Amino acid sequence: MAGAIALASAAPTPGAAAAPRVRPGTVVRWAAEGIESCSLGEKRFEPLDGACYYPVDLLQRAGPWTLARARRGRRETTTVQVGKFDYPTQRLTLPRRMVELSKEDLERVERENREMARLWTRAGPRRFSLPLAAPLDPLPKGGRFGSRRIINGQPRSPHGGTDYSAPEGAPVLAAADGTVAMVANQFFGGNAVFVDHGDGLVTMYMHLSRVDVHEGEPVRRGERVGAVGSTGRATGPHLHFGVRWRGARVDPAVLLDPQEIQAIG
């Protein structure tokens, strides 16, 4: 989702106050009785537990963002203000070959990015509920979602997931019911599992020491999909847990804890 989105031929919801501010990487919840459908630009989707949920991409440009829904036979809109958010800077030192890529490695990364991009456009019936289940039990403190990474002194793209330090071999668990959309060995992500949960929600589990599922296999919430490792570009054993919802890079903490979701009136 690049740039601000404006919806035409719709009147603002009566009683709307000043637009609430939201941060990139969050999820906005707009609840009311009688919601029939939700929309954002040309995308339409079904309400979840009586509310519309709008994921805000980590790189969503600051500015007004207009949300819409159909409720009791009428179309309603509201506006939120996507603000600038200063995520922390993370400095890492890694082997040179993992930062300054050879022609072959660069071609591999580009191919893997294309393979992942196809997953972000998947659509199907919703198979999950909120909050999601933790991918580790117990779940350690995570961090660094959205951090601006400086690797070997060179600025790199923001971190689009959350890293959880855990012992090598610790079980990694599916966050919700779904289908294994892809299993891969990636240059950056190492051994990785991607699970499609429907409604455009895909969770990813990276740097695994082993993979316990196969592509096309159904998985249940809390089922083991692999084990913590340090494969790919990693400084030590940890789980990189990422979430894409309708293409947007979302902070996993938002979907693991309902208190983190930003509710608007």
Question: At which residue positions do the language-model features occur?
Answer:
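Short, well-structured beta-strand-loop connectors
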Residues: 171-181, 213-228
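Surface-exposed, glycine-biased beta-strand/turn segments
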Residues: 79-189
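N-terminal export leaders
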Residues: 1-3
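Cationic-aromatic interfacial patches
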Residues: 7-86
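Zn2+-dependent peptidoglycan hydrolase active-site motif and core
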Residues: 160, 175-212, 237-239
